């Protein structure tokens, strides 16, 4: 195991994350717990495959006297990067949901004569709820695609990882 190039493990892990993101992008409002479970296994596998080679590559060229500081900076940057991506993902979901809701409700108005039928009054709330569900689903799909794209964008950067010559 120690003879494997860490770039192989990182590449494999990020490719699995890309597959996981694309799998999540195929979710719809009728997604089952099985779909979520399969995807959770994929993501767990990916993170497990990425973590050890990433840590090995990070500390391979670090002198032992800098190990404590290097570890602190490594974990700080990892946590900071995760937090930033989570914040951007939540922002993408919220903005995308609002944009799609507005787009889907453009022609649905009290002033639209085609919809001014007295028997439709009770359906307005149900219609608004369904449009909200669909808009939110589009928002989540956009975030899942961004997750897959971010995982894919990391792949060329793995080529920059260098291990010390032994």
Model-derived features with residue positions:
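Intrinsic disorder in cytosolic terminal tails and internal cytosolic loops
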Residues: 119-120, 124-133, 161-166
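C-terminal module of multi-pass small-molecule transporters
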Residues: 1-107, 136, 140-165
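Juxtamembrane non-transmembrane "cap" segments at the membrane-aqueous interface
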Residues: 98-124
